[in-house]
Amino acid sequence: MGPMVERVQVMRGTHRGIGPLFGPLPGVRLGEVIAYEFELPARFEPWPGRTRLERTFVLLDVGVSFANPCWVRTRNPDGSILQMDPKGRDSWYVDLLTVDVQGDRYTFRDLYIDVIIPTDGRHHRMLDLDEYADALADGTMSLQEGIDGLRRWQRFLDRYIHNDRWPQAGWSDFPPASVRRLFELPALLTDPVRWEG
């Protein structure tokens, strides 16, 4: 029968409490995976056939989150337009996180390093390693946090992206098989929380 899905609350934010946390967001946990959803504001235009409801998954074993962004373009508050690559519809955006657990409440904070993982055969694209280095250099992140983050990131890459020494034609386990049941669930929220960022 397998593990049962349990309801949890999720808070999300930037590293070290810079800015307010967003939440609580209703979510679910199945084994070592959490899924939660929130609605993007109207300035985000969804891909055809999709809504502004964004589902994010968190792999607790390595402390990373990932989502298949539901939007194709957005108008930023300064009036500029950010447009996704048309090939990006089925790509995944992955973030390294810190994870804090208090009962059934999970707080996830961004830990700078990101990777975009396409599912159409293109290579992945690493981002924000410079921000990670800056946080270590200026003391925003402790040395111990930095070491832990890099070790978990390498475990993620080895376990889910390339588990052989030499890269294969596809990803080892991405999107991970462990998220399949949560991916297939209908909408998790009856009244989604809207992000106003």
Where are these regions (language model features)?
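Structured beta-strand/loop patches that form or line metal/cofactor-binding pockets in enzymes
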Residues: 56-113
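A long amphipathic alpha-helix within ATP-dependent nucleotide-binding catalytic cores
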Residues: 95-97, 101, 106, 150-163
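Cysteine/selenocysteine-centered motifs that mediate thiol-based redox chemistry or coordinate metal-sulfur cofactors
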Residues: 152-197
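A hydrophobic, small-residue-rich beta->alpha segment in the mid-to-C-terminal subdomain
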Residues: 111-159
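Short, well-ordered loop/turn elements at secondary-structure boundaries
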Residues: 30, 87-88, 118-120
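Charge-rich, low-complexity N-terminal segments
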Residues: 1-56
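Intrinsically disordered terminal and processing segments
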Residues: 34, 39, 44-48, 52-59, ...
